[in-house]
Amino acid sequence: MTIGVVVFPGSNCDRDVQWATEGCLNLPTRRLWHEETDLSGLDAVVLPGGFSYGDYLRCGAIARFAPVLQSLMDFASKGGRVLGICNGFQVLTELGLLPGALTRNQNLHFICEDAPLHVSSTRTDWLKAYGNAASLVLPIAHGEGRYQCSNDTLKQLQDQDCIALRYGSNPNGSVDDIAGITNPSGNVLGLMPHPERACDPATGGTDGRSMLKALLN
């Protein structure tokens, strides 16, 4: 079991993810520079948080053209597991692997706090360890985390059981309290909260550990 962590210019949570996968779960982890295209030997790929390419134009708008992401499209289409955290979620929507968009928070401020969450679906392997309606708390840290989509897209997400996580107390104005969604196949998960920051009691909780432990199965 080997995990790939994509590193863009401007990423700042890649080492946090690597610590969670290697330091907490003892999983071999390979850092993937944005210009790489070889994903062979990887069982899952994580797109970490940060400010890829400085978030110029729009969050994730430039990152979508990175060579590594062209390979990721093929990886995901073949059932490879992909996790996009915060900026990684934004990149996945820009790439078209997940629908909708992440826009400025409703209050127009950067939000950094612990967020209560509810598991809305365990259809994806990433969340099966929690159980339906489970509650957890994960840190959030974003200025553009407000999930938005058309009414038709929202209905599709609801009908296909693709809404994975909802906020217990909506911090940013996301439609339907959405904190994370999956693709219809369930192998791609994008979320704004940071599970890698909640894997070690020393850093404030372990609610994110079960999500990353899904990589062991």
Curated annotation (Swiss-Prot):
It catalyses: N(2)-formyl-N(1)-(5-phospho-beta-D-ribosyl)glycinamide + L-glutamine + ATP + H2O = 2-formamido-N(1)-(5-O-phospho-beta-D-ribosyl)acetamidine + L-glutamate + ADP + phosphate + H(+); L-glutamine + H2O = L-glutamate + NH4(+). Residues 2-217 form the Glutamine amidotransferase type-1 domain. Its EC number is 6.3.5.3, 3.5.1.2. SUPFAM superfamilies: Class I glutamine amidotransferase-like. Keywords: ATP-binding, Cytoplasm, Glutamine amidotransferase, Hydrolase, Ligase, Nucleotide-binding, Purine biosynthesis. PANTHER family: PHOSPHORIBOSYLFORMYLGLYCINAMIDINE SYNTHASE SUBUNIT PURQ. Part of the phosphoribosylformylglycinamidine synthase complex involved in the purines biosynthetic pathway. Catalyzes the ATP-dependent conversion of formylglycinamide ribonucleotide (FGAR) and glutamine to yield formylglycinamidine ribonucleotide (FGAM) and glutamate. The FGAM synthase complex is composed of three subunits. PurQ produces an ammonia molecule by converting glutamine to glutamate. PurL transfers the ammonia molecule to FGAR to form FGAM in an ATP-dependent manner. This is Phosphoribosylformylglycinamidine synthase subunit PurQ. It comes from Synechococcus sp. (strain CC9902).
